[in-house]
């Protein structure tokens, strides 16, 4: 909370959480700030009889945050829909709300044969309905974050998302995306700011969407110190989700082994391993 006024501020911040039946949980904190001061507020409470969110039962709550003056006058109010769900990795298996999760997913580009790369809400919803009818439960936003309306619809209708940062390094000396530490952007400090800005912008914008269960740091961009720092930041900022990074090749910068275009023999070899350490998701095949 940032006091943009040139005078001190006294008042309160109220948080209301409303479920689909209108049941409300309310919390409030008093605040006193000097001019220009910034403070961080956290609210903690137990929500009774939580209705968990999943792709099969997309239960949502509406959170409303209201800033009031000491006399009760409303200064500002904002709201968003969110949900409660738990994503885990146990014994190299991906779990949602304690149940093993099998990803049946696709990659998504903004494209329509009639409108080109302009996709509106109606077209988004048509795609979601088509996917749900065909037992598709997950989407990778290849290779960039989608409009916020897409995430709202996935929250509402129940699609799991791998949210991918708009980073790609084709044409930067990446013969088959191999590592070139002398000049590749993933290793060069002068490129760190550009990489991290895109990753942080994605996380901060989409962090309240329950449909987002995995962050992807980018597509086909090699792997180096730039991504090591980005991975560390994501894990510190958001401990409720996991990181998928295809170029990590199952190393320390990814929580999920997520190769592209593996052969059937390679997938069988992985499936028959006695002690796998990470879940396995084929993240791209036939450019889809």
Which residues are covered by each model-predicted region?
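Secreted/periplasmic carbohydrate-active enzymes, especially glycoside hydrolases
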Residues: 1-161, 198-199, 213-214, 230-236, ...
